[in-house]
Amino acid sequence: EMTGPGSRRARAACALADGLAESPQETRLRLLLGRSGLPMPIAQCRVLHEGRFVARVDFGWRDRRLALEYDGLWHGEPGQFARDRERLNRLREAGWRVAFVTAADLRRPELLLCRLAAALAA
């Protein structure tokens, strides 16, 4: 049991951890989604098509075949960009739609949530 200054905040922070996020921004995105009232996606969702692995996406709504990916700065590197596009093509061929989120989107959460709500409704 943690006690002392800051222990209450530390316990609250630990309660929010899920162990699946691969970056602080993914955690911020998951917490935003949790407060939004939108259906919660599966974190680190494995996408299969005809029984074969296609990709693992940051967040996925399988029933809507919608993936949500957080794109940090490193996704703009030439080699990573090409790999990301190959992966995007595989997801689309499997019938999935992909929405991307950047740091700029997280600074405008209302717009991001409106965009996601529309994608979930489509």
Question: Model segments located where?
Answer:
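Surface segments flanking catalytic/ligand-binding clefts of nucleic-acid enzymes
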Residues: E1-A122
